[in-house]
């Protein structure tokens, strides 16, 4: 039967009721978008598949406002742009696919899902919808107030059409973790647990380690940490053997490890180790920031979308 619902099922409606305020204060012209992240709630009868389907979850949504008649073109553009974004994470194009909706919701004239190959099959991680003017028209109807956009060039007022992109952050997190976790058999017979996180998403970008806890090596390592910590999240680790420290950082997805040894004190170089291949190279301390920043920054990932 009917029941009262107090918690929002999506973040979108807050954007719709405020879009004109944002447009005016931001002096924006159509087309423009408003993005938001926040909690949403669904009355799921069966919450299942770990964090894939929950009653309380995090959404990242964007509503992109366009002129009526142009919505399908913008829908196609956002469809391709969003797929590029997912593929830029580096999990392989073969693990993503579109699922176009045959049956559309009452408010939509086009809709598709981006699906990711989870361990339990291809599942939706993002939805892209052309919502027409349904939401804004309904808010106008029930509030009795006009929220039409005035075009200063054509001197016309109209209700914009909306393209929506909606990501379930928890599902996105699940897809990243499922694809990143590995248990690798090494040549020496050992097993390595490694989290192959995209460097831009890794919470810690770099671990700095003195080879031993004496002879000025910890002090030199701390000096490197102090210089780099303003540029990206850097961790200092001096406990256990260097091999165990490498394994620890592999398991939490840290892309790079820097080892300070006795040669460092002589020539100001360090050993730089890459998580994915375990390969090591000797680099100057002065080069560390530029080498690592190029690989781990979110801007490097976003450049792939151009």
What is the predicted role of each segment?
Residues 1-306:
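NTP/phosphate- and nucleic-acid-binding module
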């Amino acid at each position: 039967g009917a029941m009262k619902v107090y918690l929002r099922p999506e973040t979108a409606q807050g954007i719709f009721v405020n879009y004109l305020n944002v447009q005016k204060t931001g002096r924006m012209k159509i087309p423009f978008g408003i993005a938001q992240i926040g909690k949403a709630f669904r009355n799921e009868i069966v919450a299942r598949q770990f964090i894939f389907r929950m009653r309380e979850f995090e959404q990242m949504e964007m509503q992109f406002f366009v002129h009526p008649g142009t919505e399908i073109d913008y829908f196609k553009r956002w469809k391709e742009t969003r797929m590029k974004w997912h593929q830029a994470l580096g999990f392989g194009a073969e693990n993503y696919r579109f699922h176009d909706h045959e049956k559309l919701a009452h408010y939509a004239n086009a809709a598709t899902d981006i699906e990711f190959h989870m361990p339990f099959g291809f599942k939706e991680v993002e939805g892209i919808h052309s919502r027409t003017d349904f939401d804004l028209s309904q808010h106008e109807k029930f509030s009795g107030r006009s929220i039409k956009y005035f075009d200063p060039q054509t001197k016309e007022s109209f209700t914009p059409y909306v393209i929506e992109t909606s990501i379930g952050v928890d599902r996105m997190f699940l897809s990243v973790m499922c694809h990143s976790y590995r248990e690798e058999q090494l040549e020496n017979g050992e097993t390595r647990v490694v989290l192959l996180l995209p460097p831009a998403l890794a919470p810690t970008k770099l671990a700095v380690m003195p080879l031993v806890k004496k002879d000025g090596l910890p002090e030199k390592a701390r000096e490197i940490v102090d210089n780099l910590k303003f540029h990206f999240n850097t961790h200092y680790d001096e406990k256990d053997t260097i091999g165990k420290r490498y394994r620890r950082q592999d398991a939490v997805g840290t892309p790079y490890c820097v080892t300070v040894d006795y040669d460092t004190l002589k020539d100001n170089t360090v050993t730089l180790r890459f998580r994915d291949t375990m390969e090591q190279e000797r680099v100057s301390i002065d080069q560390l920031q530029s080498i690592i920043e190029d690989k781990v920054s979110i801007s490097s990932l976003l450049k792939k979308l151009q």
